[in-house]
Structure formats: structure tokens, C-alpha cells
């Protein structure tokens, strides 16, 4: 029938890998980030800061790849959910992608503000987005911290929606993304 959305069972394997990789990296990044306000200035703290910077660079790389893959390979559509739900899900996913990407760039700038280098996997140095003491970079750090709460709220909505589909609607929405 014209205009009918074909039924697709699962996401492709790379989409699933990227989804769960980004989730794991962001969860680890959040855990390390939560420890950072409570640290002092000793060698052990510098290791924690280095981990946060390295994880941030890894998150940035993973979300950039996921975003490029998503653009090249749109989400498989399904008739299992209403059109309005598909639209809300699509909008939420794009906001999550862009929010995570923005947080990594803002964190990068905030790191430069403190005069610390940003290295991908602790090896490949990335260019500075700002100079040490740059007022914009300080603001970037404040926004970076604020966006953590926005990200947590959106992830909570994402998880609740997935659980709703699995346990209440009893459709395949959640299972399509499971490994």
C-alpha cells in the first residue's frame, strides 16, 4: 500500500555497537566527572583528570562516528509505534547526538582554559580550541557542567520510553537495539 512503512526487525550491527559504546563511554565519563568536584591537587587527582579528558576525547570520536553513520544510514522505520511517537523519538535522538557532541566540544574548550592538553586516547594531541584563561572557555566549562543535567534528563526519558515499549506496549522497540 502506498505510504506504508515497511516492518524492520532490528537495527544494523554497527548502529547497535555504536549505541552501546557511546552509552558505556558516557556512563564512565559521568562516573569520573562526578568524582572531579571532590578532588584536590595531587598526583592521583591528575590521573583522574587525565582519565576524564581521555574519556571525553573517546566520547567525542564515538559520537561523531555514530552521528555520521546515522546520517548515512537512517533509522529503520516500523509500524509498531504511532507516527507522533516516531517523530518524538527521532527528535529526541537528534538532540541526544548533538548534546553529547556539544558537551565534548565544550569540555575540550574548558580543558584548554585550564592550560591542559587534550589528547585522543592519551596519545594524539588535539589542537587547542581556546587559550589558557580565555573567558569564553571558562563559560564553556560552566555550560558543559550544566548540560550534564540536561543529558541525564534526556537519557532518563529515553530509558523510560524504551521500558514502556518493552513492558507495557510489548512491542519490539527495545529489542531492536539489544545486542
Write out the residue ranges for each language-model feature:
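Membrane-embedded alpha-helical bundles that constitute the cytochrome b-like, heme-associated redox core
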Residues: 1-179
Amino acid at each position: 500500500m502506498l505510504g506504508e512503512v515497511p516492518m524492520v526487525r532490528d537495527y544494523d550491527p554497527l548502529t547497535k555497537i555504536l549505541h552501546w559504546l557511546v552509552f558505556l563511554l558516557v556512563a564512565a565519563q559521568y562516573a569520573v566527572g562526578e568524582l572531579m568536584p571532590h578532588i584536590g591537587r595531587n598526583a592521583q587527582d591528575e590521573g583522574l583528570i587525565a582519565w576524564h579528558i581521555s574519556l571525553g576525547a573517546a566520547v567525542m570520536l564515538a559520537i561523531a562516528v555514530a552521528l555520521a553513520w546515522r546520517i548515512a544510514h537512517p533509522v529503520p522505520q516500523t509500524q509498531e509505534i504511532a507516527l507522533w511517537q516516531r517523530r518524538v523519538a527521532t527528535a529526541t535522538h537528534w538532540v541526544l547526538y548533538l548534546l553529547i557532541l556539544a558537551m565534548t566540544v565544550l569540555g575540550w574548550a574548558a580543558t584548554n582554559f585550564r592550560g591542559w592538553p587534550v589528547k585522543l586516547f592519551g596519545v594524539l594531541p588535539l589542537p587547542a580550541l581556546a587559550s589558557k584563561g580565555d573567558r569564553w572557555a571558562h563559560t564553556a566549562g560552566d555550560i558543559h557542567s550544566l548540560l550534564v543535567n540536561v543529558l541525564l534528563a534526556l537519557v532518563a526519558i529515553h530509558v523510560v520510553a524504551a521500558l514502556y515499549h518493552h513492558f507495557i506496549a510489548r512491542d519490539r522497540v527495545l529489542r531492536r537495539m539489544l545486542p
